[in-house]
Swiss-Prot record:
Belongs to the RNA methyltransferase TrmD family. It is an enzyme of class 2 (transferase). The gene is trmD. The keyword ATP-binding does not apply. This is tRNA (guanine-N(1)-)-methyltransferase. Keywords: Cytoplasm, Methyltransferase, S-adenosyl-L-methionine, Transferase, tRNA processing. It catalyses: guanosine(37) in tRNA + S-adenosyl-L-methionine = N(1)-methylguanosine(37) in tRNA + S-adenosyl-L-homocysteine + H(+). Homodimer.
Amino acid sequence: MNITVLTLFPEMFTALNHSIVARAQEEKRIELNYVNFRDYSTNRHGRVDDSPYGGGAGMLLMPQPIFDAIADLPEAKRRIIALTPTGRRFDQRLAEEWSKETDLVFLCGHYEGFDQRVHDELVTDEVSLGDFVLTGGELAAMTMIDATVRLLPDVLGKAASHEDDSFSTGLLEYPHYTRPADFRGLTVPEVLLSGNHARIETWRREQALRRTLERRPDLLETADLSETDRRYLQSISGLSND
């Protein structure tokens, strides 16, 4: 997978030189490139922003540097993703969708964002990290790149490493425990020490359902629930409201 980031601050992305994303680069599973679109400004001072037509607060990123930077990229069938608080909210399903692509381009905005013509003519995806506003798109891009890259084949070693992650099943993930079994009087649930895999799977599913009901009940509206799941949720729904 080729990933290109258009940004005014490429130095911010050194965080991706660590951990899983770094390993994916070392193993040639992804290629990460950063383009400072200020380099494409035709303004002799390297200016990339101007005041908006019609007035209003803030400055807007001009279309010319973005259009020229995109035109300079190698020809490819690509997703061009604008990071914007007005976009679709990023989620695990979108990360999974992107992980099947071969070429992603992230546009990191600043100030009041991009001239609308960038969105109309270049962008395939307008995506937001959440219902809040960041200073720029860089942190959002790093988050989305990490979430996408870890889903690529063999990046985590085996598929099971992410198949039970929160949101991958439509639910929040169940609690995890490791040694020691008793830490300062805080004990691991007995079922996890039982060796009974069927009981363990049931416990994990129920814990995921309970956690989702308590913390993100909105996810249950679209989760793939069995009749057993529904009965369990019904049995605890009164408790979760107490």
